C-alpha cells in the first residue's frame, strides 16, 4: 500500500518529507519520491528502492529548497517498478501523488491524447494529473471537482498546484 505525506509551513520541506516517508516504510513499497515547491518552481526527486536511496538523492540535489511539498512511497499497481513510474507525477501546473486504482485511466488517457496530453509513464496517476491539468483554469477546487466526476475507481490524491 502506498504512503502519502504533505507539508507546508515555515521550515524546509525536503527533510521533513523524507523523514515522514521513512516513518511509512512499514507499509511496503517499491519506489519513493518527493516534490518541493519554492514559490516559483517545483522540483522532483524520485527513485526505485528504499527511502534511504531517496534521501541520498535528495541530499545530492542542488537547490532543492522550499516550504511546501508532497511525498510518496509506491506499491506498483499500473506499470513496472521504474523511476519514470514512481510518484510524484507532473502535468503543467499540477503535481500529484495518488493511492488507489483509477479504473478508466486508459480511456481517459486516449481522450487526453486528442487534447495534446502525452503520458511518459505507464501509471494511472499521471493520467489523473493530466486530467486535472486539462480542467485547471486557476481554481484548484473546481478542477478537482470536475476531475472527480470523470474518474472511476477508489483513490486518494495529494496535489500541489504550481501557482497556489
Show the residue positions of the predicted features.
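Conserved short alpha-helical segments that host acidic/polar catalytic motifs at enzyme active sites
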Residues: 1-164
Amino acid at each position: 500500500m502506498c504512503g502519502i505525506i504533505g507539508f507546508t509551513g515555515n521550515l524546509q520541506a525536503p527533510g521533513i518529507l523524507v523523514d515522514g516517508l521513512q516513518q511509512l516504510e512499514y507499509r511496503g513499497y517499491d519506489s519513493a519520491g518527493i516534490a518541493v515547491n519554492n514559490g516559483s518552481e517545483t522540483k522532483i526527486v524520485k527513485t526505485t528502492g528504499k527511502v534511504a536511496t531517496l534521501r541520498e538523492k535528495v541530499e545530492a540535489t542542488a537547490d532543492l529548497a522550499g516550504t511546501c511539498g508532497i511525498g510518496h512511497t509506491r506499491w506498483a499497481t499500473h506499470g513496472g517498478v521504474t523511476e519514470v513510474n514512481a510518484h510524484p507525477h507532473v502535468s503543467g501546473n499540477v503535481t500529484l501523488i495518488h493511492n488507489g486504482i483509477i479504473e478508466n485511466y486508459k480511456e481517459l488517457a486516449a481522450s487526453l491524447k486528442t487534447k495534446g496530453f502525452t503520458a511518459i509513464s505507464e501509471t494511472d496517476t499521471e493520467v489523473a494529473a493530466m486530467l486535472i491539468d486539462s480542467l485547471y483554469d486557476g481554481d484548484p477546487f473546481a478542477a478537482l471537482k470536475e476531475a472527480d466526476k470523470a474518474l472511476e475507481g477508489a483513490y486518494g490524491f495529494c496535489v500541489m498546484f504550481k501557482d497556489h
